[in-house]
């Protein structure tokens, strides 16, 4: 028995509303939380507002999240007391964006596999949104002042595009959307560049029998370059070498070589 499309839409809307409520409650409860990385992102956001690009372009901190913070600070112009709550408002906006991208991904999966069969569609919708809320609040953590939620959004969106490519949608528009997702994902965090190789390789493999697939993948790469290229060029000029970021060096030192994260405190 097929689940009526209107019923599925209402259920989806209800689950999305519940997810937004959970996100809003968590963002409000953590509105005064802050940690060291968040302070650095705020410093970069303030540099962006001053148009101090020498300070804003940084090989360790990626630019997309500070740009969101700068936009919010520029719009609301909060006092010192309200500055951190505005930061968590940005986190909630990032959470809502991630929710929309997750919906796009889940809709693609369900439309290809369940065709609104009841109760399967209802069960998978409920399970999917429950996992999204849990992972966003506990693993990605909406309370943490970081770009991780924007990275999650880009991965959800790219995954949704890949699902549609696997299903046979090989249009230029879908490959353009893949480039947009991966380009902004890189601006959120540089490691998305490595993920981009995986996504583009899978897209190429799954659409390999489609005439003109190379041109479509090249379109994805071109759009990525248009989005990320200016930042890479500025960063490379500032660093004196071609680079997409240097955060991997510190993380390799901390997590592979086990270099102490903090200097000796004298105890």
Explain the meaning of each model-derived region:
Residues 30-43, 55-72, 78-85, 240-246:
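Extracytoplasmic catalytic/substrate-binding loops of multi-pass membrane glycan-assembly enzymes
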